[in-house]
Amino acid sequence: MQLEATPRGTGSRASRRLRQAGFVPGIIYGPGVEPLAVSVRSTQLERLVERQGRGHLIHVQVEGEANPRQVVIKQLQRDILTQQVTHVDFLQVDMNRTITLTVPIVVVGEEQARRRGLLITHELDEVEVECRPTEIPEAVTLDVSGLTEPGPVTAASLSAPPGVRVLEDPDTVVVSCTVIGGGEEEEASTGPAA
């Protein structure tokens, strides 16, 4: 997807005026790249994030430049009440070097675990990965369909496509698995003494 960007002035007043006019202030930076303050249309950015999420290669055409810049969204800041994007950081990438970015975790097999009486609680929704810009995954997956016992499932069990390295500590808990109704059964068996 392509975004159109316009170079902008800096400062909180200028940023506030941009937001009121329907734009999001942002910055493009990266290794060997002079940081450039830009603005993008709020509707265009929101649509892109809604359709593709944050972990995708984006072509940003900066007004006055001949070629689009290859970037990824490094950080989105949102208004705490409205959830509208208030600022965006774009990391300009070198197509021949690896980058670090955050991608979502997709848990598969929850229905099978539920049929076995297990409840899956999500502890971590996204994870940092390292890969080339052309290998950015939609997500990394965690398959819980084979779980038969309660307990934690860690980042060591995440599955990433070839060329993608998960940077999360392997011992970090991604989901917790508990027995459905386990607490109630225990209370019933230790009921009041006669």
Swiss-Prot record:
Coiled coil: none annotated. The keyword Protein transport does not apply. Keywords: Ribonucleoprotein, Ribosomal protein, RNA-binding, rRNA-binding. InterPro entries: Rbsml_bL25/Gln-tRNA_synth_N, Ribosomal_bL25/Gln-tRNA_synth, Ribosomal_bL25_b-dom, Ribosomal_bL25_C, Ribosomal_bL25_long, Ribosomal_L25_dom, Ribosomal_uL5_bac-type. One of its GO terms (cellular component) is cytosolic large ribosomal subunit. It holds the Pfam family Ribosomal_L25p. Gene3D superfamilies: Ribosomal protein L25, beta domain, Ribosomal Protein L25, Chain P. One of its GO terms (biological process) is translation. SUPFAM superfamilies: Ribosomal protein L25-like (SSF50715). It comes from the Bacteria. CDD domains: Ribosomal_L25_TL5_CTC. Part of the 50S ribosomal subunit; part of the 5S rRNA/L5/L18/L25 subcomplex. Contacts the 5S rRNA. Binds to the 5S rRNA independently of L5 and L18. HAMAP family: Ribosomal_bL25_CTC. Belongs to the bacterial ribosomal protein bL25 family. CTC subfamily. This is one of the proteins that binds to the 5S RNA in the ribosome where it forms part of the central protuberance. PANTHER family: RIBOSOMAL PROTEIN L25/GLN-TRNA SYNTHETASE, ANTI-CODON-BINDING DOMAIN-CONTAINING PROTEIN, RIBOSOMAL PROTEIN L25_GLN-TRNA SYNTHETASE, ANTI-CODON-BINDING DOMAIN-CONTAINING PROTEIN. This is Large ribosomal subunit protein bL25B. It comes from Symbiobacterium thermophilum (strain DSM 24528 / JCM 14929 / IAM 14863 / T). The gene is rplY2.
